[in-house]
Amino acid sequence: MKILIDENMPYAAELFSGLGEVIAKSGRTLTADDLIDVDALMIRSVTKVNAELIEKANKLKFVGTATAGMDHVDQALLKEKGIFFTAAPGCNKVGVAEYVLSCLMVLAQQHGFSIFDKTFGIVGAGQVGSYLAQCLDALNISYLLNDPIKEQEGDSRSFVALDELLEKSDVITLHTPITRDGEYPTHHLIGQKTLSKLRNDQILINAARGPVVDNQALKQRLLKQDGFKAVLDVFEFEPDVDMELLPLLSFATPHIAGYGLEGKARGTTMIFNFYCEFLKRNERADPQTLLPIAPIPNVTLNQQWDHSTLHNLIQLVYDVRKDDAVFRKEIATVGAFDKMRKDYWDRREYSAITITGTQCCDLTPLQQLGFTIEEV
């Protein structure tokens, strides 16, 4: 049995090698010839699974993507061909939410505001958007939710229309899939018309899919230099990046918002476990058993934490400025976008820090954010 895996999928080689012959290749450059005699294909979001890719896949029975998003896979085609497909929903939700919080903490420090005084507008209330809302609840930060599809499906949460969210939010953070059809397409959801209405004190963050934001229109909006700010982790035509847009962004990163080591381990183990079920085998993997000890010091709190403490804790785990600096330095090099993703450092989640506190400290909000808590 041959199993073709994306070479950038951590822990995949060691897990899948127990099931068959593992072949590791670059996910972005896969061709139809690579799938000849392959039984299973394990990918990430850079691989487009379409008719061209699988035209010679004479033995393919299983495709798994170790990502939450699925827009890179022609699911109808796979179903038609009798090829089982699965994804890893929610695997990256913690990393993306922590990315957003890091961006806002740094911007707050740079521009002299408090995120606790801001209203967040979360566009897309799936796994990532819902987890971010959970984090904001823990910190008692107000937010609005927009997700017309979930609202139509009867989701009991309180939703608002997109126009209302854009008008009333200080921070607009996007967490939708990319869709071009249907009643609520998200392609260029944030386009020229929408961008022209945004206030100069608003912040836009796209850590979803690049084409959700019209990058050309965003560039024109930022050229006004009136205080409006934008953060992009994803780009409309990635791995190509508009080099005129880049200097206008507050932060820019190469599609790594959800690239925490825990999230990648969850994604890999989820599709490994799905594949074992598909094969009717008993093997199962636990991501926690794969993770190394985090090189992050534990923290002791002897008094009640405040906003400054929270800022320091968040930046101790992940400071977006590190990735932003590397991105700006390297992106002009040919192939840099994918290389930065391939060589991405072992970023950890809040759970990698253990916070020890005395009884005088209410650590519940920090625990709800994901930090590991020990009370003495």
Curated annotation (Swiss-Prot):
PROSITE patterns associated with the record: D_2_HYDROXYACID_DH_3 (PS00671)
Catalytic activity reported: 4-phospho-D-erythronate + NAD(+) = (R)-3-hydroxy-2-oxo-4-phosphooxybutanoate + NADH + H(+)
Record-level GO BP terms: pyridoxine biosynthetic process
GO CC term, one of those recorded: cytoplasm
Keyword annotations from UniProtKB, A to Z: Cytoplasm, NAD, Oxidoreductase, Pyridoxine biosynthesis
Positions bound to NAD(+): Q127, V128, D147, T176, D233, G258
Subcellular location: Cytoplasm
Record-level Gene Ontology MF annotations: 4-phosphoerythronate dehydrogenase activity; NAD binding; protein dimerization activity
Pathways per UniProt: Cofactor biosynthesis; pyridoxine 5'-phosphate biosynthesis; pyridoxine 5'-phosphate from D-erythrose 4-phosphate: step 2/5
EC number assigned by the record: 1.1.1.290
Keyword hit for NAD: yes
InterPro entries to which the protein is assigned, alphabetical: D-isomer_2-hydroxyacid_DH, D-isomer_2_OHA_DH_cat_dom, D-isomer_DH_CS, D-isomer_DH_NAD-bd, Erythronate-4-P_DHase, Erythronate-4-P_DHase_dimer, NAD(P)-bd_dom_sf, PdxB_dimer_sf
Highest taxon, organism lineage: Bacteria
Chief site of localization: cytoplasm
Residues passing through the membrane, by range: none
Active site positions: R209, E238, H255
Functional summary from the UniProt entry: Catalyzes the oxidation of erythronate-4-phosphate to 3-hydroxy-2-oxo-4-phosphonooxybutanoate.
Subunit structure and binding partners: Homodimer.
Family the UniProt entry places it in: Belongs to the D-isomer specific 2-hydroxyacid dehydrogenase family. PdxB subfamily.
Protein name, entry field: Erythronate-4-phosphate dehydrogenase
Native source species: Aliivibrio fischeri (strain ATCC 700601 / ES114) (Vibrio fischeri)
Name of the gene: pdxB
